[in-house]
Amino acid sequence: MSYLFTSESVSEGHPDKVADQISDSIIDHFLAFDPQSKVACEALVTTGQVILAGEVKSKTYLDVQKIARNTINKIGYTKGEYMFDGNSCGVLSTIHEQSEDINRGVDKATPEAQGAGDQGIMFGYATNETENYMPLALELSHRILKELAALRREDKAIRYLRPDSKSQVTIEYSDDNVPLRIDSVVISTQHDPFLADEKAMLNTIEKDLKTILIPRVVAKLPQSIQVLFNDNINYHINPTGKFVIGGPHGDTGLTGRKIIVDTYGGKGAHGGGAFSGKDPSKVDRSAAYAMRYIAKNMVAAGLCDEILVQVSYAIGVAEPMGVYVNTYGTAHVSLIDGDIAKKITELIDLKPAAIEKRLKLRAPIYLETAAYGHMGRTNRTVEKKFEQPNGESKLMNVELFTWEKLDLVPAIKTAFNL
C-alpha cells in the first residue's frame, strides 16, 4: 500500500535562518584570522534588534556588530519598512571568553589527542532516490525556495517578493519506497502590499508562483523527477492570506532551531545538536558532517540503497563511544549491519582532529551551509574576503561542502569487495 511522506524547508530570510547565518558568518571570520579559534555563537533576531551571545577563545578580534549587519543586508533585509534591516537595527553583543573547564577537555598536547567538545550522538543519512543522495521531499522543498530567492533578487518576473518564505512538499511512495508522484506543495512567501484588493493580490501571487516559479524549478530537475509533477498536485499558496509582516519583525528567530531542515527533512534520524554557531571542535557539527560523508559514499559505492550511520562521543575523549549502521534491508553485501559498522571504524579515523583534517573544517566555510541545508550541497571552491576592525583584510580560496565529496568510494569498494 502506498504512503505519503512530507518534508519542509525555510528560506534564507526566515528569522531562524537569519540567526543561523549571522552565527556562521561570525564563525567564518574567526576561523579566517585564527583557524584554531574555539567559538560558540548564538543569535536572537527580533523587531529592530539582534542579540549575540556565546563563548570564544581566539587570537583575533572582530567587529561582530558589523559582521551581523553585513549578513542581514546580504540576505535582503535592507528596507526600513521591513521593521528589521541591517543598517538601522540594534546589535547587542554579550560574547565572552570560553570556559577553561570546557577548553581543558578539548585542547591536548598533540592535535591527534583532541577530545570531543561535548558528549552527544550524531547521524548521517543517504538514499539513492536523488542524484545527490538526499531525500526527495526535502530536496524539492529546498529547490523551490532557492529559485524563489533567485526570482526575488532578479526583481524582474516577480517584483513584490520579500525575504521570508517557507515550503513543504508531500510525495506519494509505493510500498517498496519508490516515489510515485508529488501529492501536494505548500508555499508561503512574504510580499509587498502591492494591491489594495487583498483577494486580487493573493490570486496574483498564486498565479505567479504556479506559472513562473514552479516551471523554473521543474526545468532544472532530472527527467526522472520531472515526471513526478502532474496537473493534480494540490497547491497551497499563502494559505493563511496576505503575508506582508514577516522576517524577524513577524517572528523572533534563534540560532539552531531548524535542525531538520538543515539535515534530512525527517528521514533517517537526528541526534538533537544544532550546527550553526559552532566551530568544528564541536562534534555536533563536525561528526554529523563526517556521518553524512560516510553515508553518501556508502550508497554511491553500491553497498546499499539507503543507510543511516550513527556515532557517539564523550566530552574530552577522542575515540568515539560507538558506531551504528542501519541499511534498512537494502545492503548488497552479505554482511549484517553490525559488521558494516565495524568495517567503517577500520576504514576512517573518527577522532575529532582526524575529521577536521580530512574534511578541511578549520577553514571559513560555514556561512554557505546556514541556509537551504547543510547536506546534499555541491562541493566547490569559492573566493571569500574577510576584514578585521584594524583594516586588515584577507582574500581566501576555500573548499565548501567537503563532506559531499565521493572520494571514499574506491576505498569502500575495496574494503567490501564491491
Mark where each language-model region is.
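Short, charge-patterned binding micro-sites
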Residues: 39-59, 315-319
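A short glycine-rich, hydrophobically flanked beta-strand micro-motif that places a catalytic Asp/Glu
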Residues: 37-41, 165-171, 233-237, 303-314
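Glycine-rich, mobile lid/loop segments that gate access to catalytic sites or pores
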Residues: 6, 48, 66, 73-77, ...
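Internal helix-turn-beta structural module
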Residues: 46, 306, 313-418
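Conserved phosphate/anionic-ligand binding catalytic regions in large, soluble enzymes, centered on
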Residues: 8-10, 14-19, 114-130, 244-269, ...
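Alpha-helical support elements that line or immediately flank enzyme active sites
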Residues: 12-31, 129-148, 278-302
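Glycine-rich anion/phosphate-binding loop at the beta-strand->alpha-helix junction
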Residues: 196-300
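N-terminal, positively charged regions that mediate nucleic acid binding
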Residues: 1-40, 45, 155, 409, ...
